[in-house]
């Protein structure tokens, strides 16, 4: 029997519903249950693929090529289960599907309405494909009271009535703000949030209360009384030092036991959380530290690089060091010397991005790393700019550039117009739509057997996730390799460069894919493990 748990949020946004959902999934997994995580996003975009990273944050790409919410990254990292396009849906996607069906005549002339057509589509999505799972955790994006979320709340209310008794539960994540002048945590915002939820027809079974200090017993009693939940169902979600402490913290508070009790399941043993304790101990007690510069375009919102931050943390865990991040806006290097910003750092990472803004700054960062022998990791756009830099500085091609920025006589990086997905040829044109038109999802690559990157991976066959429209031009391979920039990884057909490395450099690697999307705390990605390892070596030389 599959049981459904719906996670909603109240009072304010950005409370961490995704982390809470992932942590609960990890706790249930640690008890031996099979868990699926899904995300309902109320915004009208079809997917986050064309949304600004500084507004929405990272776009998390799945193996099957879906551009999804960053919370799916939390789901994967905490559970180790790869997400798919079937785990995330938006209002925009639902409306697009409904309108397409209406235009096709599928509704036989019926008047299309939010109830039942939109709510039915949401329910169908929630219930589809859950065979074999013990629990399905469904996170509803946004905050209770948001007008965009009303169809989703109505849909999960209906599911509470339609599913057999004992198969559905609701968790409400809320905030208990501390008022210094009063010297106490305030429960009134939570009471109002629950009242709003109940006015929709949803009675939460568990309150997960974010706070920065212990909740006094009297406040727990007040919340239980006014929000109509058991006192044991008022769960303290106190701030912790690391997100990898969240499952341990929620486990100590009994969140998983309370969920099992809701479904009439007796918790006969404790969850097996030893590996989480090991990760927590390594994060809290590093044996050293390194400093890494991230030269990016969206540094104003760290969520734009969420998976990258976590992958670097995983590399630190593997090397037992703390990773300190120095955020540098790439545009700064277009008007200032990079040296004062980068001196004394142990590694430079240039992440993905789109557009000309900051491109020359990233090129200068790559040159500094190459010339000063500092470990350099270029991801997607960061690889492309490293190749442009090498073409200009090493191969004697001063006009080398990317066609992404306009016409150029030396298109070292150009628009990717066709590529193979399995046995099928995919094509794109420059004039096409932006949404969903990139090389997306998991693709295989072949690494040169004697390359550094093959040594790091421990093999020559890899599969990594991509998200890009532009690709390094193979026509420049011979000239670049003659100057020490090796094309060490190619697509299976040998037509697309996937990895490059600078020979004779301590650690200079560029990859066209996004390895950060596949890194896990218990299985750090080999490239991040190696990069941080190289930074540790560099730290001993400074």
From Swiss-Prot:
EC number: 6.3.4.2
Gene Ontology CC entries for this record: cytosol
Keywords: ATP-binding, Glutamine amidotransferase, Ligase, Magnesium, Metal-binding, Nucleotide-binding, Pyrimidine biosynthesis
Gene Ontology biological-process annotations: 'de novo' CTP biosynthetic process; pyrimidine nucleobase biosynthetic process
InterPro entries given in the database record: Class_I_gatase-like, CTP_synthase, CTP_synthase_N, GATASE, GATase1_CTP_Synthase, P-loop_NTPase
Pfam families reported for this sequence: CTP_synth_N, GATase
This protein's pathway: Pyrimidine metabolism; CTP biosynthesis via de novo pathway; CTP from UDP: step 2/2
List of catalytic residues: 380, 514, 516
Keyword match Iron: no
Keyword Magnesium listed: yes
Residues holding L-glutamine: 353, 381-384, 404, 469
Family: Belongs to the CTP synthase family.
Name of the protein: CTP synthase
């Amino acid at each position: 029997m599959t049981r459904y748990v719906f996670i909603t949020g109240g009072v304010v946004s950005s409370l961490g519903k995704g982390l809470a959902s992932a942590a609960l999934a990890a706790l249930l997994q640690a008890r031996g249950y099979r868990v699926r995580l899904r995300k309902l996003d109320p915004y009208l975009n079809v997917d986050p693929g064309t949304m600004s990273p500084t507004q929405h944050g990272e776009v998390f790409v799945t193996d099957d090529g879906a551009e999804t919410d960053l919370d799916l990254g939390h789901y994967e990292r905490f559970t180790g289960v790869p997400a798919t396009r079937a785990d995330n849906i938006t209002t925009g996607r639902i409306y697009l599907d409904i309108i397409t069906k209406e235009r096709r005549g599928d509704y036989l002339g019926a008047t299309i309405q939010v109830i039942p057509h939109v709510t039915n589509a949401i329910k169908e999505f929630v219930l589809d494909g859950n065979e074999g799972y013990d629990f399905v955790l469904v996170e509803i994006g946004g905050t209770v009271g948001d007008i965009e979320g009303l169809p989703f709340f109505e849909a999960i209310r209906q599911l509470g009535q339609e599913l057999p008794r004992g198969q559905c539960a609701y968790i409400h994540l809320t905030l208990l703000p501390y008022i210094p002048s009063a010297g106490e945590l305030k429960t009134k915002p939570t009471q109002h949030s629950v009242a709003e939820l109940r006015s929709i027809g949803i009675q939460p079974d568990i309150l997960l209360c974010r706070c920065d200090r212990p909740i006094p017993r009297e406040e727990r009693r007040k919340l239980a009384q006014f929000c109509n939940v058991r006192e044991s169902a008022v769960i303290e979600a106190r701030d912790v030092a690391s997100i990898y402490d969240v499952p341990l913290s929620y486990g100590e508070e009994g969140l998983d036991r309370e969920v099992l009790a809701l479904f009439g399941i007796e918790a006969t043993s404790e969850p097996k959380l030893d590996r989480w304790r090991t990760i927590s101990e390594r994060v809290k007690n590093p044996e050293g530290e390194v400093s890494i510069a991230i030269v990016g375009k969206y540094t104003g919102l760290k969520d734009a690089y969420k998976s990258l931050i976590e992958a670097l943390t995983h590399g630190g865990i593997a090397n037992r060091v703390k990773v300190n991040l120095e955020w540098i806006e790439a545009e700064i290097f277009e008007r200032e010397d990079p040296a004062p910003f980068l001196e004394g750092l142990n590694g430079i990472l240039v992440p993905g991005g789109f557009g000309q803004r900051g491109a020359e700054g990233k090129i200068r960062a790559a040159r500094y790393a190459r010339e000063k022998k500092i470990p350099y990791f270029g991801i997607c756009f960061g690889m492309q700019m490293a190749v442009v830099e090498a073409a200009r500085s090493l191969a004697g091609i001063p006009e080398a550039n990317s066609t992404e920025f306009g016409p150029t006589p030396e298109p070292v990086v150009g628009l990717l117009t066709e590529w193979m997905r399995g046995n099928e040829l995919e094509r794109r044109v420059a004039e096409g739509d932006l949404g969903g038109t990139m090389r997306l999802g998991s693709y295989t690559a072949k690494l040169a057997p004697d390359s550094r990157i093959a040594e790091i991976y421990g093999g020559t066959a890899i599969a990594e996730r991509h998200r890009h429209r532009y690709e390094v031009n193979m026509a420049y391979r011979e000239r670049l390799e003659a100057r020490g920039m090796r094309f060490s990884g190619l697509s299976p057909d040998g037509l697309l460069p996937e990895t490059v490395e600078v020979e004779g450099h301590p650690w200079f690697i560029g990859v066209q894919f996004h390895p950060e999307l596949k890194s896990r705390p218990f299985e750090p990605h080999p490239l991040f493990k190696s990069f941080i390892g190289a930074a540790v070596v560099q730290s001993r030389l400074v």
